[in-house]
From Swiss-Prot:
This is Phosphoglycerate kinase. It comes from Anaeromyxobacter dehalogenans (strain 2CP-1 / ATCC BAA-258). The keyword Kinase applies. It is found in: Cytoplasm. Its main location: cytoplasm. The gene is pgk. GO terms for biological process: gluconeogenesis; glycolytic process. The lineage of its organism: Bacteria, Pseudomonadati, Myxococcota, Myxococcia, Myxococcales.
Amino acid sequence: MALRTIDALELAGKRVFIRVDFNVPLDPQGRVTDDARIRAALPTIRHAIQAKAKVILASHLGRPKGKPEDRQKLTLEPAAVRLSELLSQDVILADDCVGDGVKKLVRDLKDGHVLLLENLRFHPEEEKNDEAFARELASLADVWVNDAFGTAHRAHASTAGMARFVKEKAAGFLVQKEVEYLGKALGSPARPFVAIVGGAKVSDKIKVLENLIAKADAICVGGAMAYTFLKAQGVPVGKSLVEEDKLELARQILERAEARKVDLLLPVDHVCGAEPKETAERVVVNDRAIPDGLMGLDIGPKTLDRYRQRIAAAKTVFWNGPMGLFEQKPWSEGTFGVAKAMAASPAVTVVGGGDSAAAVEQAGLVDAMKHVSTGGGASLEFIEGRELPGVKACEE
């Protein structure tokens, strides 16, 4: 099924409801501390403004629990202020996302003007994908556009439910870019195709690994999950984090990779500490085996070198999950080393959301990558080969 995109629709004079992802971090004063998600939605919003649509934006923010203070803490007002600055035009903020007051604001909205509805999750019906709530949201719209890839894996009222009750629907440019890059990296990659997979647990990445074994030429494994694989091969891992109940599964994954002639690379040296703390002494262990009393907290320099060489020789590189406890400086070299190697590569470089995206952002290398996914859970499910409700709703 082909994705229908916003530029294929006639928008002039229509009420265009765009589901965006403005779930942005705020400081204690309620100011936006990172506007990346707001900026990511600008191409779609600007397109609708220039097409003289009546632009209605909707998003969630945080996880409201129905407490009165949530209304102050989790209001979308800071996002409205920042968006107004970025667009250099007024953004009207509604005090709710449904109800008579909102209907009046929509009725009075002029072509090319922007209305931001208040936090969708102030209504529990949003996450329950309640039909009556979805119909009420749909009554505000002639056109429904999904540009919130970060929530595309959730079948909520605004991300999937209301699409059934709106005649015209499409994906925004951000969702289009996500599907294009993630789809291309996994569907028809330029080869050699190298995947870098990290993170703490094998159990979190089983489906990802299975899908990548079917598609990649090589998989470089880092993060704490590497110790479960090493232990499955009989390599001593000291007191590193290991999922004991996943050792058999790790063996099966290694066998499957071998059967498919996929190089599954594991660390050959490690950066270790006695405990996962910034203050712990940093010990480089120049061997696959980790001595008793130490735990692996990052890939070692030889491993990073091997992974760099694979990245340099690749035509497509996909990265999901850090190589170590990168939030703490002593254990961050592996993760930032991978980020720098990808940034220096002429290959199609795709970073699959979550911690890897945070690391790339921290390293200031976002613009050096072909694509950094804005979806953590959504990009993970996409890589696993699952259907995303928020994307399916945009298909023709």
